[in-house]
Amino acid sequence: MSEEERKQHVVLVHGACHGAWCWYKVKPQLEASGHRVTAVDLAASGIDMTRSITDISTCEQYSEPLMQLMTSLPDDEKVVLVGHSLGGLSLAMAMDMFPTKISVSVFVTAMMPDTKHSPSFVWDKLRKETSREEWLDTVFTSEKPDFPSEFWIFGPEFMAKNLYQLSPVQDLELAKMLVRANPLIKKDMAERRSFSEEGYGSVTRIFIVCGKDLVSPEDYQRSMISNFPPKEVMEIKDADHMPMFSKPQQLCALLLEIANKYA
């Protein structure tokens, strides 16, 4: 295969409360290697103002921008999907719906569901292993008691101590300015059936462990790996929960290796 034929379309999916902006260090590095890169804003995230957070109560609604992108791809095009943190659930949904359009999916310290439990299984496990005190000034709220979706937003203290503790202070300050409330859609995830073996389970998965992640600790990451083993496990030992900021060069090197090896 020629070098030109190896160039891939890489799709980057952000985690909770963030947006496409969080990939600003990664996107140009991948493009410099010749790849086409699309960073997606999920619904009511980043600079997406076309949807209101009060209108989002399901995973489909939250993931709609990613699904629209996948639908628009030609039938003969396959992408490299990369998801971070909560974005792993949107990745899984895309894999389940469009398995033939994805060459490989990369879970970057991301929630990686299995094909036996409901998608909320991985989130519920994290919440059980994390006390409310550890979330510090993160706000979990609802617009009104009978609203079916819970909103949450990371607080600045939580971001500084647990999300960005090894990242440049400039990136932490940028994030403080740009994070938005995120729909938790927990009820929908809990009621949803498991992802299928024929769809989600058929796509090659790679997991990138972040060794200094205080939000999704390494033990939690490896429990997801043991529960539903991916094709390969890679590691960035000194990355916090935000490797695109704390270790962008190492993350890009792994993504380039994955694209070359599996796409």
Curated annotation (Swiss-Prot):
The keyword Hydrolase applies. InterPro entries: AB_hydrolase_1, AB_hydrolase_fold, MES/HNL. It catalyses: methyl (indol-3-yl)acetate + H2O = (indol-3-yl)acetate + methanol + H(+); methyl (-)-jasmonate + H2O = jasmonate + methanol + H(+). It comes from the Eukaryota. The active site is at residues 85, 213, 241. Keywords: Hydrolase. It is an enzyme of class 3 (hydrolase). Its EC number is 3.1.1.-. GO terms for cellular component: vacuole. Pfam families: Abhydrolase_6. Methylesterase shown to have carboxylesterase activity, methyl indole-3-acetic acid (MeIAA) esterase activity and methyl jasmonate (MeJA) esterase activity in vitro. This is Methylesterase 3.
